[in-house]
Curated annotation (Swiss-Prot):
The keyword RNA-binding applies. Belongs to the SmpB family. InterPro entries: SmpB, SsrA-bd_prot, SsrA-bd_prot_CS. This is SsrA-binding protein. GO terms for molecular function: RNA binding. Its main location: cytoplasm. Residues 135-155 are annotated as: Disordered.
Length: 155
């Protein structure tokens, strides 16, 4: 009897820095066009996209700055680790992203990378850069919440 594959998304990587640096406003799920060795490297968790962002050229969305390490067992045929990768989105989603990016101060950043039904998906978000005082305010708010949870646990 064969085991049924779980349809749940296995998290590959998460961009924690994006939530710290940006106020995330709107989220999208995008497929990503990859080579076979890139998928094998992702299964091994060898990816970094902390400084990456999404651009739109010729009605196509591309992720720039995502590093997928070369697959160790691939031999002499390897992928370029730092190449721009095409995102698979519907045309209306690309139009929405273009409209948001043309607004002043908004950018599109990757948030997390995961498997969904054995396909690699990338969650991207439209975000506005936080100012220093916004970051400090978030840290203060987090500390207050932590203290209230501690007090509740004590009593």
């Amino acid at each position: 009897m064969t085991k049924k594959k779980s349809s749940g998304g296995a998290l590959i990587a998460q961009n924690k820095k994006a939530r710290h640096l940006y106020e995330l406003l709107e989220f999208f799920e995008a497929g990503i066009a990859l080579a076979g060795t890139e998928v094998k490297s992702l299964r091994a968790g060898q990816v970094s996209f902390t400084d990456s962002y999404v651009t739109i050229h010729n009605n196509e969305a591309w992720i720039v700055g995502m590093h997928i390490a070369p697959y160790a067992n691939a031999g002499y045929v390897q992928h370029d680790p730092d190449r721009d990768r095409k995102l698979l989105l519907h045309a209306r989603e690309i139009d929405t992203l273009r409209a948001r990016v043309e607004q002043k101060g908004l950018t599109v950043v990757p948030v997390k990378l995961y498997f969904k039904n054995s396909r690699v998906k990338l969650e991207i978000a439209v975000g506005r850069g936080k100012k220093l005082h916004d970051k400090r305010q978030d840290i203060k708010q987090r500390d207050v919440e932590r203290e209230t949870r501690r007090e509740i646990m004590r009593h």
